[in-house]
Curated annotation (Swiss-Prot):
Tubulin is the major constituent of microtubules. The gamma chain is found at microtubule organizing centers (MTOC) such as the spindle poles, suggesting that it is involved in the minus-end nucleation of microtubule assembly. Gamma-tubulin complex is essential for the control of microtubular network remodeling in the course of initiation and development of giant-feeding cells, and for the successful reproduction of nematodes (e.g. Meloidogyne spp.) in their plant hosts. Pfam families: Tubulin (PF00091), Tubulin_C (PF03953). It is found in: Cytoplasm, Cytoskeleton, Microtubule organizing center; Cytoplasm; Nucleus; Cytoplasm, Cell cortex. This is Tubulin gamma-2 chain. It comes from Arabidopsis thaliana. Gamma-tubulin complex is composed of gamma-tubulin and GCP proteins. GO terms for biological process: cellular localization; cytokinesis by cell plate formation; cytoplasmic microtubule organization; leaf development; microtubule nucleation; microtubule polymerization; response to nematode; root hair cell tip growth. Belongs to the tubulin family. One of its GO terms (molecular function) is GTP binding.
Length: 474
């Protein structure tokens, strides 16, 4: 029985990475740009209905909502070659089309204004599912629509569909370059609060690291957004292969996440992928074995979060959990041997209070997509060094807040009216508490953490540490 997943693409970035994701899924399942099954797509064994449903004329339609407050990207999709793929009733554009002006408060406020309209769309999609498992939100945390409206949707989904899983693919801004969004630290902090309290799993897509990988690994001198987005769609499609080509394990989202997220607050995942190739790029042909792929996944240069192992404290940083999704022609005995070799060489430093094991899910490769390598792998990992990414967000926020810079843009909206900036302070406290929790994970006493000092427990709807999230219980 399919466990359907509804995808919400919010804002410019969310719609761009969402579009790439659907292109990739169409290729892998043999679905044409118009949603019609290709003549050659005769092999069964895949579950298209997790992400698609069939219209009366048998063509496949993504279970997706395209939401934006300014029309440019969605108009591009509606006039592009995949225009007939989507259900046009599931496209929401703001009436005035002015966008959110890179202001979280504007996106959040406008989200509140159109809540009924968007929730109607979501309810309609949910009613059309036999056994809805959850939602996937694609967005960025730095702008206005993806961050503000995305935050509002996360809160609303939590209220309306409290038993359903919510996973996000969240794009973090490039912190090596000066941003064209000066209020990025404010937007990021306010969104991070919602990602901490209202999401069950956040896959962190860090633009800093994606750019670095594009330059170092793909030898692109000046990577375009389209090229980094294709890296993102590779990760998104690989992370859903076990749902779309089901085996006996990890064939639904709960199963996939339950092992990765032992405590509810530490639900931010980093990813690694190998071997990487981008179209039009000279492919390096090499022998890909399971051991080679699994070893490469642990190398810092393949990991798509920049904070990882690039600072003096990295030696204390530890893995909380690892799931490797290996695609291709794989013999399970090779997996066992590879895990043994990795253990013998002590290539991985795990936390002391949990099972020190790399989990492996084997998955079929799409028969319709030709690749030059036999085996490819995606790593989804929870690692304590992710806290440095949050610490950097905090320090950038503190710099701006100290100068009281650009706060007038926020005071125009009801949440910050009458100079009430408590939302910022509360968000900061929650992210600081999250950083502390990841640091505490590195010590063997973590299980007792937060028990003695009630002040360390989270405000709002968040779970206290050590309390299992009922949605992730089997």
């Amino acid at each position: 029985m399919p466990r359907e997943i509804i995808t919400l693409q919010v804002g410019q970035c969310g719609n761009q990475i969402g579009m790439e994701f659907w292109k990739q899924l169409c290729l892998e399942h043999g679905i044409s740009k118009d949603g019609i099954l290709e003549d050659f797509a005769t092999q069964g064994g895949d579950r298209k209905d997790v992400f698609f449903y069939q219209a009366d004329d048998q063509h496949y339609i993504p279970r997706a909502l395209l939401i934006d407050l300014e029309p440019r990207v969605i108009n591009g999709i509606q006039n592009g070659e995949y225009r007939n793929l989507y259900n046009h009733e599931n496209i929401f554009l703001s009436d005035h089309g002015g966008g959110a002006g890179n202001n979280w408060a504007s996106g959040y406020h406008q989200g509140k204004g159109v809540e009924e309209e968007i929730m109607d769309m979501i309810d309609r999609e949910a009613d059309g599912s036999d056994s809805l498992e959850g939602f996937v939100l694609c967005h960025s945390i730095a702008g206005g629509t993806g961050s503000g409206m995305g935050s509002y949707l996360l809160e609303t989904l939590n209220d309306r569909y409290s038993k359903k899983l919510v996973q996000t693919y969240s794009v973090f801004p490039n912190q090596m370059e000066t941003s064209d969004v000066v209020v990025q630290p404010y937007n990021s902090l306010l969104t991070l609060k919602r990602l901490t309290l209202n999401a069950d799993c956040v896959v962190v897509l860090d633009n800093t690291a994606l750019n670095r990988i594009a330059v170092e690994r793909l030898h692109l001198t000046n990577p375009t957004f389209a090229q980094t987005n294709s890296l993102v769609s590779t990760v998104m499609s690989a992370s859903t292969t076990t749902l779309r080509y089901p085996g006996y394990m990890n064939n639904d989202l709960v199963g996939l996440l339950a092992s990765l997220i032992p405590t509810p607050r530490c639900h931010f995942l980093m990813t690694g992928y190998t071997p990487l190739t981008v179209e039009r790029q000279a492919n390096v042909i090499r022998k890909t074995t399971v051991l080679d792929v699994m070893r490469r996944l642990l190398q810092t240069k393949n990991i798509m979060v920049s904070s990882y192992a690039r600072n003096k404290e990295a030696s204390q940083a530890k893995y909380i959990s690892i799931l490797n999704i290996i695609q291709g022609e794989v013999d399970p005995t090779q997996v066992h041997e590879s895990l043994q070799r990795i253990r013998e060489r002590k290539l991985v430093n795990f936390i002391d209070w949990g099972p020190a094991s790399i989990q492996v899910a084997l998955s079929k490769k799409s028969p319709y997509v030709q690749t030059s390598h036999r085996v490819s792998g995606l790593m989804l990992a929870s690692h304590t060094s992710i806290r440095h990414l949050f610490s950097r967000c905090l320090s950038q926020y503190d710099k701006l807040r100290k100068k009281q810079a650009f706060l007038d843009n926020y005071r125009k909206f009801p949440m910050f009216a009458d100079n009430d900036l408590s939302e910022f302070d509360e968000s900061r406290d929650i992210i600081e508490s999250l950083v502390d929790e990841y640091k505490a994970c590195e010590s063997p006493d973590y299980i007792k953490w937060g028990m003695e000092d009630p002040g360390q427990l989270m405000t709002g709807e968040g779970n206290a540490s050590g309390v299992a999230d009922p949605k992730l219980a089997f």
